[in-house]
Amino acid sequence: MKPLGDVPWPPDPIVTDRLILRETRTEDRKGLAELLSDETVQAYLGGPQHTREELEELIPQDPNTRPGIFAVEHAGEFVGRITIQRRDRAWAHHVREEGDEVEIGYEFLPITWGRGIATEATRAALGWIERTLPGEPVVLTTQVANEPSLRLARKLGFVEVERFMGFGAEQWFGHLRDE
């Protein structure tokens, strides 16, 4: 995967009814450490690679390390992140021959689950993609076993392109259907 080198970053914050999507900040470090060390959140992403304490040491003071990562804020607190990046051409799974599609991903703290926050945030990010990179195909990959992620992808309008084995599990690869 590679960052969005063709997009000015950071963008202006995106404000929805309940959320703010913005660049990550120093005050997000604690929430990022919680997100990246939570076994439930990371269950379909290979599991936590570090403890929360280790991550609090490893995450840079300025966690805004690359373009394409939106921190999601709800009621003044970091609750998750959305990543937007170019899908590297080396991957075997693409929707266009030359690859390099825009790929979106999302991770949210369990306190947000079932409240529509992931849907609201991801819709806002998809709107930003459409305004910033009009006409670009948008793709998403999630484990087939990650039923909540798969439901969200379908709810957002992603349709299955194919399934494949990767990272020791069956993966679902989809693209955002044209309206």
Residue spans of the language-model regions?
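Active-site rim helix/loop that mediates acceptor-substrate recognition in acyltransferases
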Residues: 48-71
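Acyl-donor (CoA/ACP) binding surface of acyl/acetyltransferases
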Residues: 1-44, 69-179
